[in-house]
């Protein structure tokens, strides 16, 4: 019996991986333009990091984490999200002491959640995320959202929208929390068991429930906007003003809360309205987490960030029938005819690769027709044919696969000649 891939995972094969590489390259490029630097953290962390950083009342912590005991009886968890590990690294490596603040970081990496596999949701998935730590300026909130929108637009997506809300500062959140408890408590028995347990611990999460979202009490729940104090209201309005100035359209949704406990003030999601999805689908989300650095053991430092699923992005591209400009070709295929030519072909391929070209050759001693078929399948720009006759003349036959034109080139200058054509 053959061993198969674990449920909720996928192999990304040659022919598909080029799309991923292109997307990751564009993510790195936009981060370069906004001056975000890459950070790489371990794929597993101490479980305590996520209990404190993500929140022990969240679905991620309660239901979705891959947690195990190592041989030293330490509890470790495969990272389910990227923000807490980045903040842990920020604190541990004392990045808060840098002269230039905020510290602007990005990551592209695999995350792990034990979820029910479905379209666009895997148990191992790839996130692209950014974190800006060390500034309480609404301008950085607007910048983070604008970066995400610009990235999606750069991918060609048109049917996207930004949904925005504010959860306020701790005082505003506490006032809203008390109002939510008073609103839901008399009829909490009508809600699912998750919502019942959330009532006292984190009633805001009830608004995020998928099972009870159509309950009449959801539609009449107290809105956070009614409990924002003057400072929180001013902050929220400034973020909106800056987004408008940047040409980033948005919709306000007072029920948007996000699924993690560390958010304060600005929260947002970017959604796809593409008809190919069949329903509005969240592509990415993020927000401000002013208490997280301190919770993980650092000084009081504000932060904001977002994370997006690469798998969801690829689904959105397909839903909008967008084909990215991915070049899946090689520069030259070397055809060898005969044993003597085969040895020289290896040297030709080596010299071409040294010149910076992508090159392939035959390793199965096939006939010329079969080798040309391989060159076609690999989308070779040129085919170099080397046989006994060419060796005797000290030349190589070069064919342009786009035009069909052929020419003979001296062997001793062939590498530099074709490199000049292609580089």
Swiss-Prot record:
Top-level taxon: Bacteria
GO terms of biological process kind: histidyl-tRNA aminoacylation
Keywords: Aminoacyl-tRNA synthetase, ATP-binding, Cytoplasm, Ligase, Nucleotide-binding, Protein biosynthesis
GO molecular function: ATP binding; catalytic activity, acting on a protein; histidine-tRNA ligase activity; transferase activity
EC class: ligase
InterPro entries reported for this sequence: aa-tRNA-synth_II, aa-tRNA-synth_II/BPL/LPL, Anticodon-bd, Anticodon-bd_dom_sf, His-tRNA-ligase, HisRS-like_core, HisRS/HisZ, HisRS_anticodon
Entry's localization field: Cytoplasm
EC number: 6.1.1.21
Disulphide bridges: none
Predominant localisation class: cytoplasm
Catalytic activity: tRNA(His) + L-histidine + ATP = L-histidyl-tRNA(His) + AMP + diphosphate + H(+)
Family statement: Belongs to the class-II aminoacyl-tRNA synthetase family.
Assembly with partners or alone: Homodimer.
Protein name: Histidine--tRNA ligase
Organism: Bacillus cytotoxicus (strain DSM 22905 / CIP 110041 / 391-98 / NVH 391-98)
Lineage of source species: Bacteria, Bacillati, Bacillota, Bacilli, Bacillales
């Amino acid at each position: 019996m053959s061993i198969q891939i674990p449920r909720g995972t996928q192999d990304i094969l040659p022919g598909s991986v080029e799309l991923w590489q292109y997307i990751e390259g564009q993510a790195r490029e936009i981060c370069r333009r906004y001056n975000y630097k890459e950070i790489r953290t371990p794929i597993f962390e101490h479980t305590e990091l996520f209990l404190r950083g993500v929140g022990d009342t969240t679905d991620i912590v309660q239901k979705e984490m891959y947690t195990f005991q190592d041989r030293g009886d330490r509890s470790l968890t495969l990272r389910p999200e990227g923000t807490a590990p980045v903040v842990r690294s920020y604190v541990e490596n004392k990045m808060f002491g840098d002269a230039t603040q905020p510290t602007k970081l990005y990551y592209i990496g695999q995350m792990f959640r034990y979820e029910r596999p479905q379209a666009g949701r895997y148990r191992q998935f790839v996130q692209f995320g950014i974190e800006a730590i060390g500034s309480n300026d609404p301008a950085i909130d607007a910048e983070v959202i604008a970066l995400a929108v610009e990235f999606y637009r750069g991918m060609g997506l048109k049917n996207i929208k930004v949904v925005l809300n504010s959860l306020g500062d701790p005082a505003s959140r506490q006032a809203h929390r008390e109002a939510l408890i008073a609103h839901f408590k008399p009829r909490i028995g009508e809600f699912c068991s998750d919502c019942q347990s959330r009532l006292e611990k984190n009633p805001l999460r009830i608004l995020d429930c998928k099972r009870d979202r159509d309950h009449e009490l959801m539609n009449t729940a107290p809105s956070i906007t009614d409990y924002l104090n003057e400072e929180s209201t001013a902050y929220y309005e400034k973020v909106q003003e800056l987004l408008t100035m940047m040409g980033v359209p948005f919709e306000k949704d007072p029920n948007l809360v996000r699924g993690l406990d560390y958010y304060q003030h600005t929260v947002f999601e970017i959604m796809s309205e593409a008809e190919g999805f069949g329903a509005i689908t969240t592509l990415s989300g993020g927000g401000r987490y002013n208490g997280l650095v301190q919770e993980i053991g650092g000084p009081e430092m504000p932060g904001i960030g977002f994370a997006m699923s690469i798998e969801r992005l690829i689904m959105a591209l397909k839903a909008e029938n967008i084909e990215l400009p991915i070049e899946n070709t090689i520069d030259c295929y070397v055809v060898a005819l005969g044993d003597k030519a085969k040895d020289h072909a290896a040297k030709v391929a080596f010299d071409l690769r040294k010149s910076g070209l992508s090159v392939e050759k035959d390793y199965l001693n096939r006939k010329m027709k079969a080798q040309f078929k391989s060159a076609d399948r690999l989308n070779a720009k040129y085919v170099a044919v080397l046989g006994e006759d060419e060796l005797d003349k000290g030349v190589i036959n070069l064919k342009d696969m786009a035009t069909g034109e052929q020419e003979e080139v001296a062997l001793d200058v062939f590498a530099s000649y074709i490199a000049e054509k292609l580089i």
